[in-house]
Amino acid sequence: MTLKQWLVVAALGISACTPSLNWREVRPENTSLKTLLPCKPDHGSRSVTVGQQDMPVSMSGCEAQGHLLAIARLPLPPGATPEQAMQAAKQWQEAALANFKGQVTGTQTLQIKSKDAPNPGPLQRISATGVGPDGKPMQSQMVWLVHEGQIIQAVVYAPKLSAEVTDTFFAGLELP
């Protein structure tokens, strides 16, 4: 085998062992928001306590390279004012941080792409550290926005976050 042939075989072997992310465009049900996920999403629902009230939340998400990525949607009550929506989003944020004993470690401004929909303006991409269900340290980045009568949460959890994963995920958020 020549050196060139050996290098080709070695490169193919290395690439076969290197996990790659297969980013795909996803539109979670009941929203016009588009996002990128590195794997085929699963869908589910559960209740989340927001303020003093249990609220139904629909989720779409998947796991890839040790990261859990999800889009969650909480419908607002009919006739909710913008102030009530923002208060509910803040309460959901507090509940999400409390669920994994999270402490905010930083924030970044995030501007979501928008073609025709009213742009929600700059959002806060929150970084936090906490404890996972297994009792081990967990990192997270999350953002909330109010759109189409619902609060939308985009979130990534991992023992150690990869900037490639989080940056691609949040950059992929887009309104129509």
Model-derived features: positions:
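Bacterial N-terminal signal peptides that target proteins for export
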Residues: 1-7
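C-terminal motif of bacterial Sec signal peptides marking the signal peptidase cleavage site
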Residues: 13-16
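Bacterial signal peptide processing site
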Residues: 18-20
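Post-signal peptide N-terminal segment of mature Sec-exported envelope proteins
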Residues: 25-49, 53, 64-65
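A structural detector for beta-sheet-dominated domains
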Residues: 29, 38, 113, 129-131, ...
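Surface-exposed amphipathic alpha-helical segments
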Residues: 41-42, 88-104, 148-176
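Conserved polar/disulfide-associated segments of primarily extracytoplasmic proteins
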Residues: 47-139, 151
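A short, surface-exposed beta-strand/turn
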Residues: 141-148
